[in-house]
Amino acid sequence: MSEESMDTGFLVINTKDKQDKTVKKPLRILIKKSLENYFLHLDKSQCVSNLYQLVLSELEQPLLDIIMQHTRGNQTRAASIMGINRSTLRKKLKRYGMN
């Protein structure tokens, strides 16, 4: 599925603005702010080498949890929803102790 045809309209989080009003922010904006915060507070002498895996695991575990709940544990359906192979799904579930 191409990026243009994917519906990301529901990937939003309700947050509060400076006037304490509820506003919807796309998930990607919150991820970007989290990464900016990470680098802002990073000790300048630290060498970051696994940031991609760190970010991926922060997103992947709750994604798997929600999809497995949604499919009531049906791995075939879950893999289909995610667009991955069932064996790949099983590896990911095992990695996070969700098997």
UniProtKB/Swiss-Prot annotation:
Which ranges of the sequence are annotated as binding DNA? 75-94
The highest taxon in the source lineage is: Bacteria
Q: Which InterPro entries match?
A: Fis_DNA-bd, Homeodomain-like_sf, HTH_Fis, Trans_regulatory_Fis
UniProt KW Transcription keyword: yes
**What residue intervals traverse the membrane?**
none
Pfam families the record matches: HTH_8
Q: Which UniProt keywords apply?
A: Activator, DNA-binding, Transcription, Transcription regulation
Q: Which GO terms describe its molecular function?
A: DNA-binding transcription factor activity; sequence-specific DNA binding
Note the SS bond partners: none
> Where does the UniProt annotation place the signal sequence?
none
The subunit field of the Swiss-Prot or TrEMBL record says: Homodimer.
Write out the function statement from the record: Activates ribosomal RNA transcription. Plays a direct role in upstream activation of rRNA promoters.
Task: Give the record's family classification.
Answer: Belongs to the transcriptional regulatory Fis family.
Name this polypeptide is given: DNA-binding protein Fis
Q: Native species of this protein?
A: Buchnera aphidicola subsp. Schizaphis graminum (strain Sg)
Q: Which gene encodes it?
A: fis
